[in-house]
Amino acid sequence: WEESVRPLLLARQSYALHSLTLRVLGGESNLEYRVRALLENPNPTAAIYCKTGECEIRITARARSDEDGEKMCRAYAKKFYDMLGDAVYDEDVAGLEETVVHTLQEKGLTIATAESCTGGLIAQRLTSVSGSSEVFGYGFVTYWEQAKAKLVGVDPAVIEKYNVVSAPVAAQMALGAAKASGADIAVSVTGVAGPTGGDEVRPVGTVYLGAARDGVAYVKKLFVSRPDRALVRARAAQAALELALRLAQGKVPADTQALAKSARHDAAALTALDSTFLKG
């Protein structure tokens, strides 16, 4: 027993666990549908954990050594990358803000924020990352209409014509924040966080996001169907950080409409931008 059976049993019980966490943009239901087949593997295993505006895929391998476990996790992670593409934005990080800051650092870029309904939440998330002072210097909280005009150059006539919660205002906020700060990238948010303030055209949960780089603003509309103030603000901040990441990576953010800086006061261009989102 001591010389043969016991050593054999101990050897069979000896194993190491290694884990790798993929951070994925988007909701859980859509993600689970896309990767369902990969969640049924016995070793490595994979499980989805839902967060606001994103998910974690935790891959865990059981192996004879940590090195072997890492290789197994890495090989299995490639299957998720192949299936999900750049929806997988990073590995083993605390959150999207960490990836945004690190990407800006790697690219030698800076960022500014212009926030209304999020009230500084985007800036708070960015500055929670150690070293963020290298890339983030200006955060404008422009809750009042006059603050939007004074601090980031939103035209009061644009607010009056299109509403403060609109694509033209989000575009002007982003372009204005970039100009006022001198940052390479600027993101903006204007919306109705609730529980009051909505109407038929812009119900509670309606948010417009802007992101500007190289003289072009990219605008996106977000609608959070559950009228929960904290959730609307959290989802808006997450979506703004996603726009920032794509611009930092040199990509055009998906599902956005562009407005050039040269057209920020062009009535026809602003009306076309506004109409695009209202039709949707």
What are these regions (language model features)?
Residues T52, A63-R64, R213-G215:
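Short acidic-glycine loop/turn motifs at beta-strand connectors
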Residues D68-G280:
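Short alpha-helical segments enriched in small residues
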Residues W1-G53, R58-T60, D68-C73:
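Accessory alpha-helical/coil subdomains and C-terminal extensions
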